[in-house]
Regions:
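Ordered hydrophobic segments in well-structured contexts
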Residues: 29, 61-63, 127-129, 141-143
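A two-mode feature
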Residues: 99, 106, 110, 125, ...
C-alpha cells in the first residue's frame, strides 16, 4: 500500500549487525545481535532472527542484515502470504531450495519497488540467511543476496555470516568443523560474537540464539542473551584468560626477529 511504500523509502535506519548461522552434521545453529542505528543518536533494538514452522513438518529460520525497512518489508510479505494463504508461501512449498528462492524473489521485488519510488542515492539493500528443514529433505542453509540469488552451505563451508563479520570470523575458521557437536558449535559461535562485540560498537547485545536438532521438526524457543547473562559473561572472561595464557605459553621470538 502507498503509506507503507512511503515509510519504506523514508526509513534510513540500518541493521549494522552481525548474524552467524551454522549447518552441521547434528543440526543448525543461529545467532543474531539486535542493534540498529540511524546515526550515533538513534540506536534501537530490533529482532533479526525470525522463525517459521509447523511442528512435525518443517522448521525455517531467517536472519537479516541491512536496511531495516527492507528487511521488515520482506518478513512482512512472507507473513502476509501465510495469513492470506497466497501461493506460494513458506508452508506450501516442499523444499528448502524453494524457500530460499521465495525469499530471494521477495527481497528482489521489495528492492525493485523502492527503486521505482525514489531517486535518492541510498543503500536499501539487505542480505538474508535462510536455514531449516522440511520433512522428506535434509537440513539446508542459504545465503540470499540482494539480487535474489543465493548460495548453499556445504560440509566444507558449514557456516555463513552477514553484517559485521570480520571480527568473529577467525575463531570459526580455526575451530569449527562439520561434525562438531552442537553444544561445542554454540560455544564457538558465542565466542565469535564476544570477539565482535569487543571490537565493533555497531554490534550490540542482546543476542538471539537458537539451536535446531536434525530431524526433530520442532520450532525451538531460542534464548535471548542479555548483558547480565551469567554464562555469556563467564565464557567471555574465560576466553580472554585463555588467550592471554596461550600467548604466554608460546615460544618467545628468536633474536633474529627483533634484535
Amino acid at each position: 500500500c502507498l503509506w507503507f511504500k512511503c515509510w519504506l523509502v523514508e526509513c534510513k535506519e540500518n541493521e549494522m549487525t552481525y548474524c552467524c548461522a551454522l549447518r552441521l552434521e547434528q543440526g543448525l545453529v543461529f545467532i543474531s545481535d539486535t542493534r540498529t542505528n540511524a546515526g550515533v543518536d538513534h540506536i534501537s533494538v530490533f529482532r533479526k532472527l525470525h522463525t517459521f514452522g509447523v511442528t512435525g513438518e518443517r522448521f525455517i529460520a531467517l536472519q537479516t542484515a541491512g536496511n531495516l525497512a527492507t528487511t521488515q518489508a520482506v518478513i512482512g510479505h512472507l507473513q502476509n502470504a501465510l495469513i492470506l494463504q497466497q501461493e506460494p508461501n513458506l508452508y506450501s512449498i516442499n523444499t528448502m531450495f524453494e524457500v530460499a528462492d521465495l525469499v530471494g524473489k521477495t527481497l528482489k521485488s521489495v528492492l525493485e519497488d523502492i527503486s521505482s519510488d525514489t531517486q535518492e542515492q541510498m543503500n536499501y539493500a539487505c542480505s538474508i540467511l535462510v536455514g531449516g528443514q522440511i520433512k522428506g529433505g535434509d537440513m539446508q542453509l542459504y545465503n540470499v543476496y540482494p539480487q535474489g540469488n543465493f548460495i548453499c552451505a556445504t560440509t566444507d563451508t558449514p557456516y555463513f555470516q552477514i553484517g559485521e563479520s570480520k571480527y568473529g570470523k577467525p575463531i570459526l575458521d580455526r575451530a569449527l568443523y562439520y561434525a562438531m557437536p552442537l553444544d561445542d558449535a554454540l560455544r564457538c559461535s558465542l565466542i565469535s560474537f564476544d570477539s565482535t562485540l569487543r571490537s565493533n560498537v555497531s554490534v550490540g547485545l542482546p543476542l538471539d540464539a537458537l539451536v535446531y536438532s536434525k530431524d526433530s521438526f520442532v520450532i525451538p524457543m531460542g534464548k535471548r542473551i542479555t548483558e547480565d547473562d551469567p554464562y555469556f559473561s563467564q565464557i567471555s572472561r574465560q576466553w580472554s584468560d585463555t588467550l592471554r595464557r596461550g600467548l604466554q605459553e608460546m615460544p618467545k621470538p628468536t633474536d633474529d626477529y627483533w634484535r
